[in-house]
Amino acid sequence: MLLLPLLVLLCVVSVSSSGSQTCEETLKTCSVIACGRDGRDGPKGEKGEPGQGLRGLQGPPGKLGPPGSVGAPGSQGPKGQKGDRGDSRAIEVKLANMEAEINTLKSKLELTNKLHAFSMGKKSGKKFFVTNHERMPFSKVKALCSELRGTVAIPRNAEENKAIQEVAKTSAFLGITDEVTEGQFMYVTGGRLTYSNWKKDEPNDHGSGEDCVTIVDNGLWNDISCQASHTAVCEFPA
């Protein structure tokens, strides 16, 4: 109520000073400034949304974690296409070669075992005389020595004769016979005798058919039947 008379008063003052202006016009141009005391603080507003600053640099990688558990096996894949037919001939050749190698190894092993059985031996000059002390007919002695890559022991001098005597220690076949020509003793390796050490009155072909020769325990020779069994002594190059 006090504000309206005050405004009117201000208008009157303005009119009297302006002259030709009407009060109504003056009213429109008057400014009213009211200067009061500061009001009380209003209520606290709601919490705003969090702000977003600039993106920082990427940090270093962390430590390697423990291995995970083994996963379940995957499903079986599709069946593959049928392969090409193999070369059966090449396989047969390989098998044949393997079989030949096995047979060779067997032969070498058997030879080694038989040589090992000849536990006694003696060297004389360029020869080595060995025995297994097994007694057998002359034909088997020849076969055994041949299988061992040797020959039946043949003394060609007194030294070799003594070596065979010491190895055999009993009667043993020598590689000497007259099977080809009666009374003409030859080496089984070929050639006529160049050394002999016959007992007295030997060879006598007693009862006929004594075509082989043995050395007895005193080192002397005796003609004997080839079917009789005597110790096998073989010789090898030393």
UniProtKB/Swiss-Prot annotation:
Domain Collagen-like: 39-88
Descriptive protein name: Mannose-binding protein A
Post-translational modification: Hydroxylated on lysine and proline residues within the collagen-like domain. O-glycosylated. O-linked glycans on hydroxylysine residues consist of Glc-Gal disaccharides bound to the oxygen atom of post-translationally added hydroxyl groups.
Function summary: Calcium-dependent lectin. Plays a role in the innate immune response by binding mannose, fucose and N-acetylglucosamine moieties on different microorganisms and mediating activation of the lectin complement pathway. Binds to late apoptotic cells, as well as to apoptotic blebs and to necrotic cells, but not to early apoptotic cells, facilitating their uptake by macrophages.
Tissue specificity as recorded in UniProt: Detected in blood serum (at protein level).
Gene source species: Rattus norvegicus
Modified residue annotations for 5-hydroxylysine: K44, K47, K79, K82
Disulfide bridge partners, by residue number: C145-C234, C212-C226
Domains as described in the record: The helical collagen-like domains from three protein chains assemble into a coiled coil and mediate trimerization.
Ranges of biased composition (kind: Basic and acidic residues): 38-49
